[in-house]
């Protein structure tokens, strides 16, 4: 377990009439739906749909005081007339790579803006309920049900069933955790989905058997030096230094830091226990989903708004089908060709950018935007932007911000509702209801477990088991698709070409040229321009790893522990925030006299104590390393300058050339994309965040997309700093008031 540690539609052809097909309900997503252009048939049961626009409309960009909107692609809307040839997959280049066995990088993945832990969601839910009660607004209250007393035999059967599913869950979790741990120890990289599954499984194991904290965690800490010796691939080779003592200390620091972060994430994943909870939230969610899926009965608006919050972006995107992913990419004008992981990565980054922009727009005010800015904002969110009045643009943007920021409806659900092209006359609640009907069954299972955790109710072992098995099946399916892509890539190599390249084997004898007789009337000339895409600017997985190694070497040369210190400070902030959230939850429950019923689990308390001990050990290791470096090569006159995390483009290019040869033009293109202010310098810590974000996904991106990722991360950091400053000011004001 200690090893998880290292956390680790371009151009389009003309519209053609489709053959007669069965009628489908309005708002349904067809596999052949092209949602970037309403001229394409198959969206609804209609046989002819007018184009949204007949002239090219180049995208405009929304800017707030020098903070531009990032955009993945820049292309005009399709035209209603000019099209000489039909688009074919051959016009786009799809790069497929096989499985790569790479060392797990010691970098923490960038967390999306606003991603909350279970305890933070519980706190938000309590605050929302109390606020509505104080304001006298509508609060969801389930219908009163007559409590039926169970017989003794029924109670015994329920308990036996509960423990049966609990032991099954424990056995399956243990098998999955052991398999993932073995993959990590052998140098394999866990995907984002696998890491999330591993984190949840560890939280389940500690929840089911709290005594494991006393056995597993100290045992892991004791065996860390042995594991590092037996499994050298667990750490990147760039940890090798001239000083054996310094190398040992750095490895120990890296592993302890990542282990402490992982344990803190596990603590935050474990829900609180509410002794007064009667399981109503789980039953209410089951009844709600049964209404919209089976009976056809319309739930109340309060139910729809309440349960829609559970379908978070990550949960929704990870379980959408490929036709739905393609439809969303086309709606948001993203590349719709590639693997499912690539499409999800594109959508995730776009949704993160939209979420950051929503907060900026809300801060500046919708009324302060110009018409072009309103059109750009609406178009980026999949809403109609052309041929409507300014008041209409402001109205639909204000409605979006109200649903997203005030009602906390996930961005993925809002985008998916736009992709279905539902009538504008439908209310937001009805649009969300229609959207929830299209989600796969696995999403409902995950949301059912989540609602129990947020409300502090007893988690149903059967529901948890079903969700775990479904997620494991999805992970295995991804592995099969990866192997299939690798085998197809091997088949593309012609056997004759492979044999001709063998040493000592003569090549094929040249055949005499044969002139073909071509009749003039049979010659077909294609006058359409060739779509080149991003050829020459793609960044492969191997090049990402080379860039990662170069950053590690540069950090080693600078003898910098800035990254470790920053991660330790973030870990301390997480621990403090967790403690403050616990106190706030008890404070909110004290308003209704229920604070005595809420308690932290025994495993969570034990893990918290262990994390506090590890933080003290990490502080000691950092102090020891700094002392070693000062006693070694770094003297008083050779101290590291103030801007130690800033490197020049020339340094980065030289470091990458030392590892492996990369074409000069690609190096220049990549470094230019990373240098957003064009001053010739790059912050190596920011570069590490981008590498870590891309390295966790098995995708290949372009240098343009790298620049957009940098812009998105910068926006998120600015917003996070503003929110922290605002929270600090509110706390100080509350302390002064008290």
Swiss-Prot record:
Residues 229-738 are mitochondrial matrix. PROSITE patterns: EF_HAND_1, LETM1_RBD. GO terms for biological process: calcium export from the mitochondrion; cristae formation; inner mitochondrial membrane organization; mitochondrial calcium ion homeostasis; mitochondrial calcium ion transmembrane transport; mitochondrial potassium ion transmembrane transport; negative regulation of mitochondrial calcium ion concentration; protein hexamerization. Disruption phenotype: Knockout Letm1 homozygous mice show embryonic lethality before day E6.5 and around 50% of the heterozygotes die before day E13.5. Surviving mice show reduced mitochondrial calcium uptake, impaired mitochondrial ATP generation capacity, disrupted early embryonic development, altered glucose metabolism and increased susceptibility to seizures. Residues 115-135, 247-283, 445-492, 537-626, 707-738 form a coiled coil. Its main location: mitochondrion. Residues 251-536 form the Letm1 RBD domain. One of its GO terms (molecular function) is ribosome binding. Keywords: Acetylation, Antiport, Calcium, Calcium transport, Coiled coil, Ion transport, Membrane, Metal-binding, Mitochondrion, Mitochondrion inner membrane, Phosphoprotein, Potassium, Potassium transport, Transit peptide, Transmembrane, Transmembrane helix, Transport. Residues 719-738 are annotated as: Disordered. GO terms for cellular component: mitochondrial inner membrane; mitochondrion. The keyword DNA repair does not apply. Residues 115-207 are mitochondrial intermembrane. Pfam families: LETM1_RBD. Residues 662-697 form the EF-hand domain. PINK1-mediated phosphorylation at Thr-191, positively regulates its mitochondrial calcium transport activity. The modification N6-acetyllysine is found at residue 596. The chain crosses the membrane at residues 208-228. It is found in: Mitochondrion inner membrane. Homohexamer. Interacts with BCS1L. Interacts with GHITM. Plays an important role in maintenance of mitochondrial morphology and in mediating either calcium or potassium/proton antiport. Mediates proton-dependent calcium efflux from mitochondrion. Functions also as an electroneutral mitochondrial proton/potassium exchanger. Crucial for the maintenance of mitochondrial tubular networks and for the assembly of the supercomplexes of the respiratory chain. Required for the maintenance of the tubular shape and cristae organization. Essential for early embryonic development. Belongs to the LETM1 family. PANTHER family: LEUCINE ZIPPER-EF-HAND CONTAINING TRANSMEMBRANE PROTEIN, MITOCHONDRIAL PROTON_CALCIUM EXCHANGER PROTEIN. This is Mitochondrial proton/calcium exchanger protein. It comes from Mus musculus (Mouse). The lineage of its organism: Eukaryota, Metazoa, Chordata, Craniata, Vertebrata. The gene is Letm1.
